[in-house]
Design a protein with these regions (language model features):
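A short acidic, Gly/Pro-enriched loop at the edge of an enzyme's catalytic core
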Residues: 50-60
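Conserved Class I S-adenosyl-L-methionine
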Residues: 104-132
């Protein structure tokens, strides 16, 4: 999607950008990638398969996806990421940040994930936590919106209902985490 458009501009020979997609979006995503030569160095794989050959990838990044993976699927994707990364390879995560103590069902319905949960799953799958950043923090986000994170921009699921209020909050409060595969 959007991040693939950004990152594809920075991939040069012999590099490859591997874009992993869920099966639901695969056909439309492939069509988009085929429509522009800018995406010529983009390889598309399914999230439910091996992401890449073992120990072959320098870095993996995921933006605002963890809430879609909550449960066993998250373990599976983190495990596949660990296998694909070279020793010392990095795994960057940006995700809507839930308040500490938020339970799994509330995370699923709101789209916000606790930092503790993201870190726990990463550590359980062999990653080391290298760094955290507040670059995507938003203290205006109260995280108690009627349609969860999707109430805020860019989605604005309530359409014009309290639109000005939600636009003034801005995008969600997000955690930014950096993990590494041990050497």
């Amino acid at each position: 999607g959007w991040y693939t458009e950004i990152l594809a501009n920075y991939i040069h020979y012999p590099g490859t950008l591997i874009a992993a997609q869920g099966s639901y979006y695969m056909d439309g995503f492939k069509k988009k990638m085929d429509s522009n030569p800018m995406f010529g160095r983009v390889e598309i794989v399914s999230l439910s398969s091996n992401l890449a050959d073992p120990n072959s990838v320098d870095a993996i990044v995921t933006f605002r996806n963890l809430h879609n993976w909550l449960g066993p699927r998250m373990d599976s994707i983190f495990k596949s990421s660990m296998v694909a990364l070279k020793p010392g390879g990095i795994f960057g995560v940006v995700e809507h940040r839930a308040n500490p103590g938020t339970d799994l069902e509330a995370m699923k319905s709101s789209g916000y994930v606790t930092e503790a949960h993201a870190i726990e799953v990463a550590l359980k799958n062999g990653f080391e936590l290298v760094a955290k950043s507040e670059i995507n923090a938003n203290s205006k986000d109260t995280k108690d919106h009627p349609k969860g994170v999707w109430t805020l921009p860019p989605r604005l699921r309530l359409d014009d209902v309290d639109r000005e209020k939600y636009e003034s909050i801005g995008e969600s409060d997000r955690m930014t985490l950096l993990f590494r595969k041990p050497l």
